[in-house]
Amino acid sequence: AQKWAEEAVRDGVVESIEEQSGLYPMVSGFAHPMVTIIDSWGDSRISASFESLLMSLDHPYTKYLIKKNSNEITNKKTGAVLPANKKIVGIRSGTLVGDGQSYGQNQRQAYSGIDPEYLNDAPLYLVKFAEVDFLRAEGALRGWNMGGSAQFFYERGIRNAYLDEPQYVYEYNDLVDAYMQREQPIAYVQQDPMGDGADWPSVTKIGVKWNEADSKETKLEKIITQKYIALFPLSTEAWTELRRTGYPKCFPVLNTNDGDGSIPQGELIRRVPWQSTDPIALQNINNTGIPALGGPDLQATRLWWDVDAPNF
């Protein structure tokens, strides 16, 4: 990994916002898919772990990108009512959300989504400048020649991690300086306004500000946590980082028994099992895929880079 990373830096990597790569949905004549999924389909909401992470660090996205609850939410146990537009409300991963995709059928439709004003014109990133900087920050932390220090790439990555189309960059820039000075997290408690689960104190115990006195593990947690946020809403890459490093820290997943039965309670899915009804594809899976996987074709089986071992 070190050899390839250093070769990549020598040959040239993304060094500016202008060099990052992405697809612009509106230019191609269609809406940003996350806007369609959240607003049109009513099929997705912010996770409670992401809510807690952003709120614990007082991230700029909590001020403008993530919407507050869109309607009243009534606690099924106490009858208490959370008024509309009161707070950011996420859903615990693994929650049985129930049927219905309208607010009249399902109160979870009122949980927090993303403000389409800031997302609709944003690109679907393929390679993001900030992601490259966080990769270089981790490499430098490991002692690799990345062309600069871990602190330099970490801080530049945060400054260029915004999701927005250029006309909205000022929203992020107005807040990022104070954000980068945060040394300790806010003592945040995540609460489900419907009363379906217990209150969960934040598992985020790091700040944002770089500190050379931190251990390598804490520095890595800071780098990957900021990288995870910067990747939003590219969930595939963020999921990869979470599995590879264990960061950012997230709430335990609920109802893991609803998977294929291989995931221990509270753990996350390590991979998506192969699915095929084609005889030739099934033959290839059995003959080459399973041996290469090194384990059963289950959700809990780790891929070769997802090692259950210390990061250092």
Annotate each PLM feature.
Residues 162, 166-312:
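C-terminal functional modules
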